[in-house]
């Protein structure tokens, strides 16, 4: 009933564009990174069917990496691009575009945490686990130990707060805005992405600067800007998902607003967050800070602008014409590992 009421308002929905007062950038290795990412995803059996491969091709996750980390060295940028394609596919197949909870949900998510904690894959591995292990081992080699642990902690929280998101979708109505924001802050994957922003620019920030209250506020504002803008931009397809569909817009609608008013309320909050980020970033960079912290703040700006540009110029992930085919991944969920093993034998 909740979904049907929301779907009825989609045809007239107007989605706003967002702007920020700094230019976008993109690595000149973007197309090479994208091609290698597709090859890597294929080699790690993430592209479960030709239909799924075509979807990933038109989504352009390598371009997202190139826009958000334009100054990263080629080896690090490739690892980040491979991480992003893995993350989006795992998030879709484990949480978002399948049933709210399945027999495999706990096993899938705990396997991802175990890779971080134990640095090995289970036997037998779940879908995507070997790809995830490969990404983590590459990042361990490329990053300082502290930086990798920031990334790893963000990913542990992604896997564990996914359970809170599932619990919210098992309720007849959603939790409120405050509780949702807490869940969204960690299930989005933005914290691990932000933790790579310094290494991809001028090097790793020391803990005393990274955990400074103002710096953490900038990280949180970056998270909020990307997440809440995404809640608007992905609204049409998320409402058609079989499992997870509640977000900040639908919660405002649940509280009595029309869907259009809920979008505008959310957009106002995004723009306010952008203004707050700009003001605080200017204040922090006016202080005597390290080059690495300057690089981190630049990296947060790259992420905000890079994500917004990716949505407008590159990706078809949220395109209306693919909603019917892309919103429901139940036919792809829990791919048969024996079939993947046979595929590997054929390739060998």
UniProtKB/Swiss-Prot annotation:
Binding site for Mg(2+) 2: 96
Binding residues annotated for Mg(2+) 1, in chain numbering: 91, 96
MF-aspect GO terms: metal ion binding; terpene synthase activity
Gene3D superfamilies associated with the record: Farnesyl Diphosphate Synthase (1.10.600.10)
Cofactor note: Binds 3 Mg(2+) ions per subunit.
Catalytic activity from the UniProt record: (2E,6E)-farnesyl diphosphate + H2O = (+)-corvol ether B + diphosphate; (2E,6E)-farnesyl diphosphate + H2O = (+)-corvol ether A + diphosphate
Example GO biological process: isoprenoid biosynthetic process
Binding locations of Mg(2+) 3: 230, 234, 238
Protein role: Terpene synthase that catalyzes the conversion of (2E,6E)-farnesyl diphosphate (FPP) into sesquiterpenes which are important for fungi-environment interactions. Produces a mixture consisting of 8 sesquiterpenes including corvol ethers A and B, as well as traces of epizonarene, gamma-cadinene, delta-cadinene, alpha-cadinene, alpha-cadinol, and an unidentified sesquiterpene. Produces both corvol ether A and corvol ether B in similar concentrations.
Domain remarks in the Swiss-Prot or TrEMBL record: The Asp-Asp-Xaa-Xaa-Xaa-Asp (DDXXXD) motif is important for the catalytic activity, presumably through binding to Mg(2+).
Family: Belongs to the terpene synthase family.
The protein's name: Sesquiterpene synthase MGU_11447
């Amino acid at each position: 009933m909740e979904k049907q009421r929301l779907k009825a308002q989609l045809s007239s929905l107007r989605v706003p564009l967002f702007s920020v007062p700094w230019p976008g950038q993109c690595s000149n290795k973007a197309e090479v990174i994208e091609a290698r990412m597709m090859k890597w995803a294929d080699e790690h059996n993430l592209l479960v069917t030709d239909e799924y491969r075509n979807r990933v091709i038109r989504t352009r996750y390598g371009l997202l990496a190139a826009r958000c980390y334009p100054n990263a060295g080629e080896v690090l940028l490739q690892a980040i691009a491979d991480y992003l394609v893995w993350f989006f596919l795992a998030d879709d197949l484990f949480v978002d575009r399948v049933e709210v909870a399945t027999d495999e949900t706990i096993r899938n998510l705990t396997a991802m945490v175990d890779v971080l904690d134990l640095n090995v894959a289970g036997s037998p591995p779940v879908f995507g686990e070997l790809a995830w292990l490969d990404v983590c081992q590459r990042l361990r080699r490329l990053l300082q130990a502290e930086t990798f642990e920031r990334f790893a902690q963000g990913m542990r929280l992604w896997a564990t707060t996914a359970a809170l998101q599932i619990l919210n979708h098992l309720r007849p109505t959603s939790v409120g805005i405050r509780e949702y924001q807490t869940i969204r802050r960690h299930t989005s994957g933005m914290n691990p992405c932000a933790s790579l922003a310094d290494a991809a620019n001028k090097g790793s920030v020391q803990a005393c600067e990274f955990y400074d209250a103002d710096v953490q506020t900038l990280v949180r504002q970056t998270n909020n800007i990307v997440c809440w803008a995404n809640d608007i931009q992905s609204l049409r397809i998320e409402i058609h998902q079989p499992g997870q569909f509640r977000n900040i817009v639908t919660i405002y609608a649940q509280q009595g607003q029309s869907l259009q008013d809920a979008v505008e309320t959310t957009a106002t909050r995004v723009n306010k967050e952008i203004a707050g980020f700009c003001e605080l970033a200017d204040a922090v960079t006016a202080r005597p800070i390290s080059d690495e912290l300057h690089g981190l703040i630049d990296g947060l700006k790259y992420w905000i602008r890079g994500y917004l540009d990716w949505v407008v110029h590159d990706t078809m992930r949220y395109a209306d014409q693919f909603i019917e085919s892309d919103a429901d991944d139940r036919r792809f969920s829990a791919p048969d590992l024996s079939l993947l093993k046979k595929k590997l034998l054929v390739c060998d």
